[in-house]
Amino acid sequence: MARPRKSSGRMASKGFPNPIDVHVGSRIRLRRTLLGMSQERLAEAIGLTFQQVQKYERGANRVGSSRLFDLAKVLDVPVSYFFEDMSPGVQDKTPSKLMGLAHPPA
């Protein structure tokens, strides 16, 4: 009997990118363009193809923690930069909130 496939967590629902991945990608693009850096140059600096950088910036592919750390170093920002200015609508779509597991701040 085949085992059920475990969700990768990449898509929020119905094939749409996770809103947090889209936000992180938009912050990567913002910082890259503020530095006047091309996708090709950023990709080369972190050992990827420019197509992969495009996918990160669109939120189509999730950025892993070690890759996010590398991006932060190359783009000269703290890792937290990628999560700044996140709209409440995006924050409300986190899995723990969707499942009712998050506790409101005290």
Where are these regions (language model features)?
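Alpha-helical residues within the helix-turn-helix
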Residues: T33, E44, K73
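Interfacial/linker helices and their anchor residues that mediate assembly or domain coupling
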Residues: V90-A106
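Short basic helix-loop element that most often maps to the first helix and adjoining turn
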Residues: S26-R41
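N-terminal flexible/basic segments that precede or flank functional cores
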Residues: M1-I20
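Conserved hydrophobic/aromatic packing and binding residues within compact polymer-binding modules
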Residues: I28, L42-A43, V53-Y56, F82
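Short C-terminal boundary/hinge segments that cap the last helix of small helical domains
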Residues: D76-K93
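Short, basic-rich loop-to-helix N-cap that marks the start of a DNA-contacting helix
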Residues: A60-D70
